Curated annotation (Swiss-Prot):
Belongs to the small GTPase superfamily. Ran family. The gene is GSP1. Its main location: nucleus. This is GTP-binding nuclear protein GSP1/CNR1. The modification N-acetylserine is found at residue 2. It comes from Saccharomyces cerevisiae (strain ATCC 204508 / S288c). GO terms for biological process: exonucleolytic trimming to generate mature 3'-end of 5.8S rRNA from tricistronic rRNA transcript (SSU-rRNA, 5.8S rRNA, LSU-rRNA); nucleus organization; poly(A)+ mRNA export from nucleus; protein import into nucleus; regulation of cell cycle phase transition; regulation of nucleocytoplasmic transport; ribosomal subunit export from nucleus.
């Protein structure tokens, strides 16, 4: 993927989107308008696949984002959902502690099938003022060597960050950049820029702290 394939085919990667129901996974993936327009439903496993294209300084890259269509509310997902995934996003809701508490379960299911793939952890709904999951408590990604981003699906805040990080990992090229923004749905809410800067500083400060004792093996 250091350059577009000579035969003109766009490098395409299967990305699985996991996390508790209600954390905003579908809202997030639907922000990308061409992906929403071109999505396909796979009835056998109850999944919507959204092809999300991004344009980089090395050509186009596409993520086939698998969204569960709400099945996770009825327990875990079938292995067929995870098989052949090349990267993943685990999402939780920063206004709901239980969704963060369940992140290790999603991670365990993912790595049991996919083993060593690049994974981004995303804390969604940072536009909501009553944030419950604070920066200092978000440590799981550090223990498991994942990338973490605060996001707000409804405002498009940090929408591209997880995809850029994954694209660089998959391409093996930290110099890869997105050169054009995808068409996104208009923001439904606005984020408070000062608050976002404060959250970012808190995350950076938290990263410098030693990890808490392993009272609980997963958290």
């Amino acid at each position: 993927m250091s350059a577009p394939a000579a035969n003109g085919e766009v490098p395409t990667f299967k990305l699985v989107l996991v996390g508790d129901g209600g954390t905003g996974k579908t809202t997030f993936v639907k922000r990308h308008l061409t992906g929403e327009f071109e999505k396909k439903y796979i009835a056998t496993i109850g999944v919507e696949v959204h092809p999300l294209s991004f344009y980089t300084n090395f050509g186009e890259i596409k993520f086939d984002v698998w969204d569960t269509a709400g099945q996770e509310k009825f327990g875990g997902l079938r292995d067929g959902y995870y098989i052949n995934a090349q990267c993943a996003i685990i999402m939780f809701d920063v206004t709901s502690r239980i969704t963060y508490k369940n992140v290790p379960n999603w991670h365990r299911d993912l790595v049991r099938v996919c083993e060593n793939i690049p994974i981004v952890l995303c804390g969604n709904k940072v536009d909501v003022k009553e944030r419950k999951v604070k920066a200092k408590t978000i440590t799981f990604h550090r223990k498991k060597n994942l990338q973490y981003y605060d996001i707000s699906a409804k405002s498009n805040y940090n929408f591209e960050k997880p995809f850029l990080w994954l694209a660089r990992k998959l391409a093996g090229n930290p110099q890869l950049e997105f050169v054009a923004s995808p068409a996104l749905a208009p923001p439904e809410v606005q984020v408070d820029e000062q608050l976002m800067q404060q959250y970012q500083q808190e995350m950076e400060q938290a990263t410098a702290l030693p990890l808490p004792d392993e009272d609980d093996a997963d958290l």
